[in-house]
Amino acid sequence: MENKVINFKKIIDSRGSLVAIEENKNIPFSIKRVYYIFDTKGEEPRGFHAHKKLEQVLVCLNGSCRVILDDGNIIQEITLDSPAVGLYVGPAVWHEMHDFSSDCVMMVLASDYYDETDYIRQYDNFKKYIAKINLEKEG
């Protein structure tokens, strides 16, 4: 599945708004881990890694941040600023998060538990990993 913006159904009435998140429905995988990022320093970017197998959906519950995605061929830049919008980040995608607003709360839904061996933390290693995947697809 390619990286994509997911527009969650928002239910609005006089009491406020509600968004339901359901695994294997509006989230394209089984959710094994949920974490959130808050109290960020706007000038301090985060991320700067890729995962070999992990899938994620990023949701900005409050405030905003700018996300850069790089699949080795295309670089995308997306601003997340709504709790009714998620960003699917697939495996083998380098991702960076920049320009956090002071009130930003970013929730991340993940397809698996934390596993340090799944991380690619150096951009040069990421490019080599992508080249290897592309060779395997061709051969």
UniProtKB/Swiss-Prot annotation:
EC numbers, comma separated: 5.3.2.3
InterPro entries in the cross-refs: QdtA_cupin_dom, RmlC-like_jellyroll, RmlC_Cupin_sf
List of catalytic residues: 49 (proton acceptor)
Function: Mediates the isomerization of dTDP-6-deoxy-D-xylohex-4-ulose into dTDP-6-deoxy-D-xylohex-3-ulose in the biosynthesis of dTDP-3-acetamido-3,6-dideoxy-alpha-D-galactose, a glycan chain of the S-layer.
Protein name listed in UniProt: TDP-4-oxo-6-deoxy-alpha-D-glucose-3,4-oxoisomerase
Origin superkingdom: Bacteria
Transmembrane regions: none
Subunit (UniProt): Homodimer.
Effect of residue 51 to N: Retains some catalytic activity
Species the sequence originates in: Aneurinibacillus thermoaerophilus
Key word Transmembrane present: no
Catalytic activity: dTDP-4-dehydro-6-deoxy-alpha-D-glucose = dTDP-3-dehydro-6-deoxy-alpha-D-galactose
Organism phylogeny: Bacteria, Bacillati, Bacillota, Bacilli, Bacillales
Keywords: Isomerase
